Amino acid sequence: LTVTDEALGEKNLAALQDYCREAEPYTVLLPSACAISSQLLPEAALLFDQETWLQNAAAALSPLCREVLNAYPLLEENGDSRLFYRTDSRPTQLTGYLLYQALGQALDYFPYAKDSFSNTPLRYDCTGDLYARWSYDKVRADVVTALLPLEDSRSYTITHTAADGTVTRWNTLYPLEGTAEIDCILGGPAAIIAVTAEGSIPRSLLILGDENALCVIPYLALHYDRITYVDVTRCSEEQLAAIAGAEYSRTLLLYGAPTLLNTDLTAGLTALTQS
């Protein structure tokens, strides 16, 4: 992880604090793959100290949130597992399951045991956003898998809404048609992703976050019949105003360190805070 302007991370943190004062959300802070797998990198590699930064960020947000989960220790403890893809910066569905387990008490559900799921391949030979950065061609492509419930009578609908209002729908959490590569998880990133799970408990969850959040949403849909994921950097002002005016049973913030440190979230978070 390269950080070009450390001041941006502090600005984002301040904007998150302002939002948390208003919304009192639950919050998850996620490290990137290089922080968890630093032992695999050359000794000369200069790495930003994500561990300390996330600790400080969690300490700053904790007084303003119902609960803050710094996921660094959790992922470090499970570092021998495939938590991130080889060729894409997104976390795998196994990381999603670990977060799902950790969030049970905060989001008021009893997590299903891992033996209630089947590890099922969805797509082979996938390459993501990191593939072109490798200086050699010996990096193996990824297999995208999902932990699918062994028994699940729910029916699911995903609705993607782009900033210009364009809408795309699927009747599955893992659409293979109309998607490419790793985007078969919830159809990939979008400004707004609305998930309905007919048969789950009738309550709603708002998730403000980045594409890291997509790995945990399928599990949360086992316990919430309406989940709305929002990427504030992709939304229009009108969309943010509509989100701010809606009511949800719970609100979750889920951001990865690369987004917090290198992507300006301030305008979107401020729009939600002031609406």
Question: Where are the model-predicted features located?
Answer:
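Extracellular glycan-modifying ectodomains
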Residues: 1-275
